[in-house]
């Protein structure tokens, strides 16, 4: 048994058939993950690391240690302090942090991370975990390219003061008009602005729908709407966007209209009709 620094100097004679059969017990309470990998590589016997209460190092190195379950014994409840920052500008792959979180019941200190990348679901998992500490000011690149829910983007936006950027290849945003306008209007979210939008409301205020239409050059699918409310001017603006070529709003035409004006021009009403 011994401290990790001494154990790293043990012979690693590859000429011995089957390798060394050192019985090793690490006496340190805090160990760098890459050093532990070096030590268990020197023996064919599982290294006892039950004295270790803290692992430090890069996420990849720590996960390598946990994955080598036949090489060590006594791991699973350690605190972990990681040293990753931004993966050379590409953002730390958040799925690897979630894997690490699953590998130990101890707290994972992630305060060195300055940038993430990954799916929105994985990002929300990391920020929602009680086992990960030190998060809250990272930038995040969301890699999803198919469909995202605006409410989920807003949730992620609320968990970090860093800017959250969606993929330039994102195809569709979905959600209520309120949630969508919140997402597009947030200084903490950077959304491309050319994605299609599918709204889920059955009733919407025309002004809010027009505001949404101004946020994206993609077509807004309003098929779920049964009622449109608002001033006649705003309602006419929304329906004109549906009638335009190319249209920027689709699905309007058979909704109940509830006007909020007290006085309207007959010509404007004829336009709506």
State the predicted function of each range.
Residues 1-273:
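General marker for long, soluble alpha-helical cores
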